[in-house]
Regions:
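Conserved Nudix-box catalytic region and its N-terminal flanking loop in Nudix hydrolases
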Residues: 16-54
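Active-site segment of metal-dependent pyrophosphate-handling enzymes
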Residues: 57-91
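A structural signal for well-ordered alpha-helical scaffolds and beta->alpha junctions
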Residues: 45, 76-77, 120-124
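Short loop segments at secondary-structure junctions
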Residues: 11-15, 23, 86-91, 105-107
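Conserved hydrophobic/aromatic beta-strand scaffold that supports enzyme active sites
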Residues: 19, 80-84, 102
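Nudix hydrolase/Nudix homology domain
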Residues: 26, 30-31, 94-141
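Conserved N-terminal beta-strand and adjoining loop/helix that marks the start
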Residues: 1-17, 34
Length: 141
């Protein structure tokens, strides 16, 4: 089974989500979360930080990532791990593989004409908002 990760990353204010515009298939031209492949034998959290750094220039010291959820796809036999985090301070981002942009967290991420993943980013947003509210109410944030 192939393994991948994506990172649901908010700016310090929690108002904007970091996305990339895909330059290649699948979902060429659509907005997607940053992420990539998990190497064989690689610690999964380390892989998320590595991909974040490679694709955006954001260092581990700038954000604490938490594994939020997974998607298992039986065709084409892959696992997609979803990590979430919020930058602790403003940092510059730069992407070599894809163009990066910050967009409002209030977008309709279920819009398959704009966003990759056939609605999965919308599901990720709903779960991330629920978890954040739950953690606030529990006093763990």
């Amino acid at each position: 089974m192939k393994r991948y990760n994506v990172i649901f990353l908010l700016d310090p204010a929690g108002n904007r989500l970091l996305m990339c515009r895909r330059r290649k298939e699948p979902y060429q031209g659509l907005l997607n979360l940053v992420g990539g492949k998990i190497k064989d034998g690689e610690d999964h959290l380390c892989a998320a930080y590595r991909e974040l750094s490679e694709e955006t220039g954001i260092a581990e010291r700038d954000v604490k990532l938490t594994r939020l959820m997974d998607f298992t796809y039986y065709q084409p036999d892959c696992l997609l791990e979803v990590y979430a985090g919020q930058l602790c301070r403003d940092v510059p981002v730069q992407g070599d593989e894809n163009d990066l942009l910050w967009i409002s967290i209030d977008e309709d991420f279920f819009d398959a004409n704009r966003f990759a993943g056939d609605g999965n980013i919308g599901h990720i947003q709903v779960i991330a908002q629920y978890r954040a509210e739950h953690w606030r109410l529990a006093g763990t944030l």
